[in-house]
Structure formats: structure tokens, C-alpha cells
């Protein structure tokens, strides 16, 4: 059963009168006046919600690494990948010699943590092929069994800003076995089903003392295994055979332990949302771990006390990230989305711009010098007009999250501050007109 968790932490909006000269409208028997009024601190009730899982199968970016944060807790990102078979027809006039077997990794530019520290990754073999029934999928919470011992481990230093390619030489014994089987025309290369039975796939597992999570591209060449070999006849010719990730059976798995943080008691499900007033006046949003937000305006109808008739002229929502919670080790998302829901949290639509067509994305403003005036803003004029004067089942709410792509492929994050004792808190600026009969 759903619980109504409306918080009464806000005070009535403070009205700063910016009145026009009284205007007489005709020579009616009833005198009337219009006023322009500006309200600058309409309260915002922002809550944090946790998704129970996020589908990460088939993503074009994977995440690898481990990071411990005082705000978020301990997070590990593991990548599971099935590889596709590759075509090879040996020439009986040639002999073949191995050069190397290389894993090619290309950073996506995303990171979370200290990029100056080294990361150590162990590569395990999946115990069995990934098989999905019609109603199954692969999620950030999915855990698949691996062999007990790693095939190989390697260390690298993240360079997300430069997107410097990471090339990892895999064991020659593995490369030689692949080459021997290819030359012998072993039939497990004939189809993908045969190939995955012989070689179920790899799991990239970070060590638990790492202090950075790095994003890597996944495509025909990135996260690929490349067999470098020589064709030998009268001369030697270098060749490369590539085994790329079969993205239909590959995903990023996340392990998150929020012990010791404001998130520790949060349970998954929108019915378990927690208001910022119960989380240290903070609200959390992050990709891949599944945190997003709900926004309500519990005192919106208090505007009615300003006059007999209230006409909303404009409404702008301002959301402030917690100072010093970003940039050094984490990345603010450039785009965030607002979704309109009904009382039962059924999605109805996006929040659009003034043209009624363009989806708003938060209009991020960054204070490069001091960081105090960094904020997201949304034009909520139409939404506030539609909801002013409503209550109960007629009152709409807003859900806020990263874009679908960032939610499933990055750890981009925002911690919003909503402390009523601070100047920069979540707020709704409303300009409106009032009409009073005299």
C-alpha cells in the first residue's frame, strides 16, 4: 500500500511585491486593480528514489573499476562479455606464427574517482555461456558464475581526458592455442553457438582497493581481442584477426554498498522514496546505481492568499548541486530530464520548452570561479499553471533523472542541496499577477 510521505519542512512563500500603478479598466461600476508580484522562495519537496535494477545489456559503453566515496559508499563495476566468432581460412601454402594476442580498450571519457591512481583488473572465464529466455535480460544487478582462478590480471592508469588507448597483451599460450585451432580448422569457429560453448566469454573484475572507475567504448574494435600473427611463405606478412564483443550478450554489473551514508536505509521502489529533509537536506541522482528524484510543490496553492484571482506569468525551477561534490573526482551530467506523472506515478509526458516541442534538459550553468552559483534550471511555467489550484488526484508530480543513455552507461551524478538555512537551495521562482475587486 502506498504511503503519503509529504514533508512539511517548508515555510509559506515570501512575497516581494513589485507592484505596477493601479490601472482602471473602463468605467465599470466595479473598480478593479492588477498587480505584478514576484515570489522568490516557493518551496520544493525533492526526494530520492532507488530503482531495483537497470538494464545494461547491449550498451556502447562499459564501466570498469572500484571506488569508495564518503557520499555514495563503495561501488564496483564489472564487465561481462561474450565474444563473436571470426572467419579464418588457412592457406596450405603458408605456415603461421603467433605475434601476440591483445585486448584493445578505448576510454569513453567517463570516470569516477582518482584518475592518477592505477587500476588492477583480473580477467576471468565465464563458467557457462550466457543464455536468455524470451522474458529475460541482463541488468546492473545480474551476477554470473566465473571460473575460480583468473586467466590473467593487468594494471593500467586511467587517462579518460585524453582517451588514450589501453592495449593489454594477453598470455601467449592462449593466443597460440587460438591460432593452432584456427589453422586446424576446428569446427567450433563455424557458428556462434559452437563458439560460445567452447569459449563462453570473459568477465573483467576490478580489485577492491582501486580508487577509480573508468568508462570504455564497446564496438567492433573497442574491448576487442586481436590475434596478431604472421603468414609465412617466401616472405612474412603481418595479419590481424579480431574477435569483437557480441553486445547482445554483454553488460555492466554493479555492486553497491552504501553503508555509512545517507543512502544506507533507502530501499528500492518509488513507494520507498525518502525526502531530502530526512537525508541531511540532500537528494541524490546517479547513473548505473539507479538513483533518481521526485519533485513536488506542496505550498503552491498558498499563492491564492495574495489576491482574489492569481494569474501565473512565469515559473522557473532552480536546482543547486552541493558545493565541492563534483569536478575533482566526479562529473556533473550536462543533461537531466523532467517527466510529468499523475498521482499514481504513471508517466504522462516530458517537460517541454516554451515551443512545446523541445524537451528541456536542465540548462546547466557552471560557476567556474567559486562554484557557488552552479545550478540547473527548468522553465515550469506551463506545469505550474496546470497544477495551481489543484490537489489530491488532480495534482501532478515530477520525476527527474539522467537521460536514458547516461543512466545505463555512466556514473554521472548530482547531489542536490535543499537546506532551508542556506541561500542556494532548490527553489521555484514564480512571477504572477493578482486581481482584486475594489
Give the ranges of each region predicted by the language model:
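Secreted, disulfide-rich extracellular signaling modules
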Residues: 2-6, 12, 18-438
Amino acid at each position: 500500500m502506498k504511503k503519503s510521505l509529504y514533508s512539511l519542512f517548508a515555510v509559506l512563500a515570501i512575497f516581494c511585491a513589485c507592484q505596477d500603478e493601479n490601472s482602471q479598466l473602463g468605467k465599470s461600476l466595479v473598480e478593479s486593480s492588477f498587480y505584478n508580484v514576484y515570489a522568490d522562495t516557493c518551496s520544493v519537496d525533492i526526494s530520492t528514489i532507488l530503482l531495483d535494477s537497470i538494464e545494461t545489456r547491449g550498451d556502447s559503453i562499459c564501466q570498469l573499476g572500484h571506488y569508495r566515496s564518503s557520499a555514495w559508499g563503495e561501488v564496483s563495476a564489472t564487465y561481462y562479455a561474450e565474444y563473436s566468432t571470426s572467419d579464418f581460412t588457412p592457406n596450405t601454402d603458408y605456415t603461421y606464427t603467433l605475434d601476440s594476442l591483445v585486448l584493445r580498450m578505448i576510454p569513453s571519457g567517463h570516470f569516477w574517482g582518482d584518475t592518477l591512481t592505477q587500476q588492477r583488473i583480473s580477467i576471468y572465464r565465464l563458467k557457462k555461456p550466457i543464455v536468455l529466455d524470451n522474458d529475460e535480460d541482463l541488468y546492473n544487478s545480474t551476477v554470473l558464475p566465473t571460473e575460480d582462478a583468473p586467466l590473467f590480471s593487468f594494471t593500467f592508469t586511467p587517462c579518460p581526458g585524453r582517451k588514450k588507448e589501453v592495449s593489454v597483451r594477453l598470455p601467449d599460450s592462449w593466443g597460440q592455442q587460438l591460432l593452432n585451432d584456427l589453422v586446424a580448422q576446428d569446427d567450433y569457429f563455424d557458428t556462434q553457438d559452437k563458439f560460445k560453448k567452447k569459449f563462453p566469454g570473459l568477465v573483467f573484475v576490478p580489485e577492491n582497493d582501486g580508487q577509480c572507475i573508468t568508462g570504455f567504448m564497446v564496438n567492433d574494435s573497442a574491448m576487442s581481442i586481436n590475434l596478431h600473427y604472421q603468414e609465412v611463405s617466401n616472405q612474412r606478412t603481418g595479419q590481424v584477426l579480431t574477435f569483437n564483443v557480441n553486445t547482445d550478450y554483454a553488460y555492466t554489473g554493479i555492486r553497491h554498498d552504501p553503508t555509512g551514508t545517507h543512502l544506507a536505509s533507502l530501499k528500492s521502489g518509488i513507494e520507498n522514496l525518502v525526502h531530502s529533509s530526512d537525508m541531511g537536506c540532500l537528494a541524490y541522482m546517479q547513473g548505473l546505481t539507479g538513483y533518481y528524484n521526485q519533485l513536488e510543490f506542496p505550498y503552491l496553492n498558498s499563492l491564492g492568499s495574495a489576491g482574489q484571482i492569481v494569474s501565473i506569468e512565469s515559473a522557473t525551477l532552480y536546482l543547486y548541486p552541493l558545493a565541492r561534490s563534483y569536478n575533482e573526482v566526479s562529473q556533473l551530467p550536462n543533461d537531466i530530464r523532467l517527466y510529468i506523472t499523475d498521482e499514481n506515478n504513471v508517466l504522462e509526458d516530458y517537460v517541454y520548452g516554451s515551443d512545446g516541442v523541445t524537451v528541456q534538459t536542465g540548462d546547466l550553468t557552471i560557476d567556474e570561479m567559486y562554484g557557488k552559483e552552479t545550478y540547473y534550471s527548468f522553465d515550469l511555467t506551463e506545469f505550474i499553471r496546470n497544477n495551481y489550484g489543484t490537489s489530491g488526484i488532480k495534482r501532478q508530480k515530477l520525476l527527474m533523472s539522467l537521460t536514458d543513455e547516461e543512466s545505463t552507461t555512466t556514473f554521472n551524478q548530482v547531489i542536490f542541496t535543499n537546506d532551508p538555512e542556506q541561500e542556494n537551495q532548490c527553489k521555484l521562482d514564480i512571477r504572477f499577477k493578482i486581481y482584486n475587486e475594489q
